[in-house]
């Protein structure tokens, strides 16, 4: 039985006690990863309680029904003593009719909350991990891996390779991304999303995903999203069409050297029929050279409303799948450390015999049950050396031997820094560098090995294109003819002599 003013006082006290608990929790040293995760879950729970108390307090201060205003007026009026004794009488009557009712102060409630926090068994209900996840240190993607193996027309990988490449979905052609593929991506995203919430409860994941959504919409409108860009495949080029400058060609035979796909793309761009043999396509395209109007007989039929509707549905389906892939890229980036640790853990388990794995599991369970305060201490690492498979810093001589003290910066990868020459050389074949080259419109071939600057890559690509253009077969200069006397001349000279009647 509380008045509005008493409720406000109680909520203010509750907020102050919650703030004190959060400060104490934040200042407490966390000896290991398990304690850190539990501490962040406790902080999140306290923040939610603080938010709820603040919302209730704000509603009371808004006083939409004017009850608070009326209560203050009654206490501050001329009959304040009569009001006081009337309320005291109500309180006595309430406890007389409810003798078992006990008012528990907030201090007792918070003491009980602190006792629960200090008991690990009671706090284990806040977050749970499987045995494979190792208390939040490793990923358990076995179920997702089984779904991946059941996908048709995808490369079959072992589990370790899958761990390091499950986000390389841009390498899968869009034609193979069917309903089963979408179920696989949704399952993988659900697991990664839930895992991030368990190991990083204080992370503003909704804000991160909102940024991903905005960035995806921008890339989709520009046609640059990985795996779905306009320049991604020849089929996409053929479907959208690309204009071709015919001024550089003097005959349809020269156009035929471009191939079926390029001719089809040019015909689609002009709205012409794109079927037929190579010669028919080349002749049809060459017949439009220098003409301002096109022959209606050469025009392609407009797609029906049914076909347009099917294309629209297919476009929306591709967009939904691409949106799921954008989330997958973000999840993989947030879990990069756990991903690398999972690979090392799986490799270490595969290198052991069955008996050694059982002994290791027993030792791990015993170490978790021990109360050694130094067991999970953060290792002494003043030089910020990388951690080995045992979770301890590697020796400094090994750090220098592998050249990990040398940093390599790659502008094509978005100014990403690689530690050591081995990681630097390996990254040219990895997804980050390949995606950067794809955004530049340059194939990631051996010609561009060790090229890290965007300007250098573009310059080299222009040079390679000019060399390829110079090596291109030119019929007028390289096609040879022989006259009746056995003289061998090129095509252009032969036609000039023929027109002049000198043959």
Swiss-Prot record:
Zn finger limits (Matrin-type): 408-439
Coiled coil segments of this chain: none
Tissue specificity as recorded in UniProt: Ubiquitous. In ovaries and testes, it is expressed in all germ and somatic cells. Highly expressed in spermatogonias and spermatocytes. Highly expressed in the germ cells of larval testes, while it is weakly expressed in fat body cells, in polyploid nuclei of salivary glands, and in larval brain.
Chain segments carrying region Disordered: 296-317, 341-384
Cell compartment(s), UniProt: Nucleus
Superkingdom: Eukaryota
Bias type Acidic residues, positions: 358-377
Presence of the UniProt keyword Membrane in the record: no
Effects seen without this gene: 'Noisette' means 'hazel nut' in French, and is due to the small size of testes in mutants.
Pfam families: SDE2_2C, SF3A3, SF3a60_bindingd, SF3a60_Prp9_C
Residues annotated with Phosphoserine modification: 360, 365, 367
An example molecular function term from Gene Ontology annotations: RNA binding
Chief location bin: nucleus
Entry keywords, A to Z: Metal-binding, mRNA processing, mRNA splicing, Nucleus, Phosphoprotein, Spliceosome, Zinc, Zinc-finger
GO CC annotation, single: U2 snRNP
GO biological process, one term: mitotic cell cycle
InterPro entries reported in the protein's UniProt record: Matrin/U1-C_Znf_C2H2 (IPR000690), RNA_Proc_DNA_Dmg_Regulator (IPR051421), SDE2/SF3A3_SAP (IPR025086), SF3A3_dom (IPR031774), SF3a60/Prp9_C (IPR024598), SF3a60_bindingd (IPR021966)
Family: Belongs to the SF3A3 family.
Subunit structure: Probable component of a the U2 small nuclear ribonucleoproteins complex (U2 snRNP).
Role of this protein: Probable subunit of a splicing factor complex required for 'A' complex assembly formed by the stable binding of U2 snRNP to the branchpoint sequence (BPS) in pre-mRNA. Involved in male fertility.
Protein name, UniProt field: Splicing factor 3A subunit 3
Source organism (scientific name): Drosophila melanogaster (Fruit fly)
